[in-house]
A protein has these predicted regions:
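Generic hydrophobic alpha-helical segments
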Residues: 7, 42-43, 116
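Sec-dependent N-terminal signal peptides
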Residues: 4-13
């Protein structure tokens, strides 16, 4: 019995670690989160007067709605909790900034604003 306890503890720790690691997101989910992160970064830049962000149309309610709907849809479909969705969004935002990819992704994402199914089944 004494030998089983460490094995069970190791298995429990392994299961806990596995549960904390989110399943890989689909390409559709990653793009929704990537657009959400890009919209958030640009909107923040617009609020702070960043010249690069001001080159885009004003991102207001429509971009916020996209962000909320996309995050909720990905949480539901991918089984993420709030911590998981925050981590996924932060990772996408970091990647956009680290690879100077905001401009190219905005070209893809901006047309999605206002589309009936752009972020999550309106």
């Amino acid at each position: 019995m004494i030998r089983i306890v460490p094995v069970l503890a190791l298995l429990a720790a392994s299961a806990s670690l596995h549960a904390q690691q989110a399943a890989p997101l689909s390409l559709e989910h990653r793009m929704a989160l990537r657009c959400s992160a890009a919209f958030a970064l640009v909107a923040h830049g617009q609020e702070t007067g960043a010249a690069a962000a001001l080159a885009y149309p004003p991102l207001g309610g429509e971009a916020r709605e996209y962000f909320v709907r996309a995050a909720a849809r990905v949480m539901d479909e991918a089984g993420l909790d709030e911590e998981g969705i925050r981590a996924a969004l932060a990772a996408e935002a970091r990647d956009l900034v680290d690879h100077d990819s905001i401009e190219p992704i905005m070209q893809v994402c901006l047309p999605q604003l206002g589309e009936p199914d752009s972020a999550g089944h309106r």
